[in-house]
């Protein structure tokens, strides 16, 4: 590995030490449905977000709730202490499209309609809310 590449890799590694996130990959739900749930909790305090997800009727809410609990646990492990109420916020959450399974459904006159079974990847970041984020 070259010197510049090594320095860049070390910087990325150091930056990851201050990021607290969790990833959920290959979720068999369409990204559009998952984004509805992600939009509900974006920017919320984590305890309030857990409450919103718990009482949401959407199927994806249970998966995002589990992901949020994982991100909180990651924060607690890196900081070696429990998170206090009002301390952590969902700073970033985004949903990306995953692999699509393509299936055929029989249709009239010998045709076949394509069914796309979509999946997605969810990435959730938690952290303390800074003054810069409040102004945006």
Curated annotation (Swiss-Prot):
InterPro entries (alphabetical): Ribosomal_uL22, Ribosomal_uL22_bac/chlpt-type, Ribosomal_uL22_bac/org-type, Ribosomal_uL22_sf
Is this entry keyworded rRNA-binding?
yes
**Spans traversing the lipid bilayer:** none
Q: Which GO terms fall under biological process for this protein?
A: translation
List each coiled-coil range.
none
Q: Which UniProt keywords apply?
A: Ribonucleoprotein, Ribosomal protein, RNA-binding, rRNA-binding
Give one GO molecular function term: rRNA binding
Q: Where is the secretion signal located?
A: none
Query: What does the UniProt record say this protein does?
Result: This protein binds specifically to 23S rRNA; its binding is stimulated by other ribosomal proteins, e.g. L4, L17, and L20. It is important during the early stages of 50S assembly. It makes multiple contacts with different domains of the 23S rRNA in the assembled 50S subunit and ribosome. The globular domain of the protein is located near the polypeptide exit tunnel on the outside of the subunit, while an extended beta-hairpin is found that lines the wall of the exit tunnel in the center of the 70S ribosome.
From the Swiss-Prot or TrEMBL record, give the protein name: Large ribosomal subunit protein uL22
């Amino acid at each position: 590995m070259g010197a510049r590449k090594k320095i860049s890799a070390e910087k990325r590694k150091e930056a990851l030490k201050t990021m607290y996130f969790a990833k959920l990959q290959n979720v068999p739900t369409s990204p559009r449905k998952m984004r509805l749930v992600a939009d509900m909790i974006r920017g919320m305090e984590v305890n309030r977000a857990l409450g919103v997800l718990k009482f949401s009727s959407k199927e994806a809410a249970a998966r995002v709730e589990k992901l949020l609990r994982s991100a909180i646990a990651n924060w607690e492990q890196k900081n070696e202490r429990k998170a206090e109420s009002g301390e952590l916020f969902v700073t970033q959450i985004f949903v990306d499209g995953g692999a699509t399974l393509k299936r055929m459904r029989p249709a009239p006159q010998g045709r076949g309609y394509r069914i796309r079974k979509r999946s997605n990847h969810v990435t959730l970041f938690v952290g303390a809310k800074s003054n810069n984020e409040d102004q945006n």
